[in-house]
Curated annotation (Swiss-Prot):
Substrate binds at residues 26-29, 81-84, 94-97, 121. The gene is rpiA. Belongs to the ribose 5-phosphate isomerase family. SUPFAM superfamilies: D-ribose-5-phosphate isomerase (RpiA), lid domain (SSF75445), NagB/RpiA/CoA transferase-like (SSF100950). One of its GO terms (biological process) is pentose-phosphate shunt, non-oxidative branch. It comes from Listeria innocua serovar 6a (strain ATCC BAA-680 / CLIP 11262). This is Ribose-5-phosphate isomerase A.
């Protein structure tokens, strides 16, 4: 059985050149990208990574990939990340792994953004996957109540233990569920204006290249 995530994740490494500063995304597909980059570094590739999560940082360090914080670089040449959904307009939902705020900050600082996905992530309309909002713990119930009064259903993300999930930044996540985002731009405006919502998982103007692994073993490269 073809591992769509693995073939897409490894393919993205072909865009990495010696001397680059590389944004390292978070998730089960970009995991394979980082593993491959680790092999390339061991063979002499000279890159500097900027991680988007503690999980990614730990993986990269274990593999010997040199890292710097976002504060310590002036620009990022290429960022490789995964996605929960992406439509034909190159608009996507990210944040299933809880790293949306850091992922968006790293994407914003990048000259090029490459997303690696399996073919099930390509959709005609966003919304089957929950849309995460990173919110500060102070007053999160007010945000939830306000959204639900506006007809937007949300759920507070929790760990398997039942405890409230906390992001690497110490915040909570409200997931918008049972909602189709037919006008992502309007949703961006709506959500960005809510006090206490630090970031939402709509990525609308970032991705340049999609690398899609297919069950057949083919890899589709989709450029903006």
């Amino acid at each position: 059985m073809i591992n769509q995530k693995k073939i897409a994740g490894e393919k993205a490494c072909e865009w990495i050149e010696d001397g680059m500063v590389v944004g390292l995304g978070t998730g089960s597909t970009v995991y394979y990208t980082i593993e491959k980059l680790g092999e390339m570094v061991q063979k002499g590739l000279n890159i500097t990574g900027v991680s988007t999560s503690i999980e990614t940082e730990q993986q990269a360090r274990t593999l010997g990939i040199p890292l710097k914080s976002l504060n310590d670089v002036t620009k990022i040449d290429v960022t490789i990340d995964g996605a929960d959904e992406i439509n034909q307009a190159f608009q996507g939902i990210k944040g299933g792994g809880g790293a949306l705020l850091r992922e968006k900050m790293v994407a914003q600082a990048s000259s090029k953004n490459i997303w690696v996905v399996g073919e099930e992530k390509l959709v005609t309309e966003l919304g089957k996957f929950p849309l995460p909002l990173e919110v500060i713990p102070f007053g999160w119930k007010q945000i939830k109540r306000m959204l639900e009064n506006d007809g937007v259903e949300t759920t507070l993300r929790k760990q398997s233990s039942g405890e409230i999930y906390e992001t690497n930044n110490g915040n909570y996540i409200l997931d918008i569920i049972n909602q189709t985002f037919t006008n992502p731009e309007a949703w961006h405006e709506k959500l960005a204006g809510i006090p206490g919502v630090l970031e939402h998982g709509l990525f609308l103007h970032y991705v340049d290249i999609i690398i899609c692994g297919k069950a057949s073993g083919e890899i589709e490269i989709i450029k903006k």
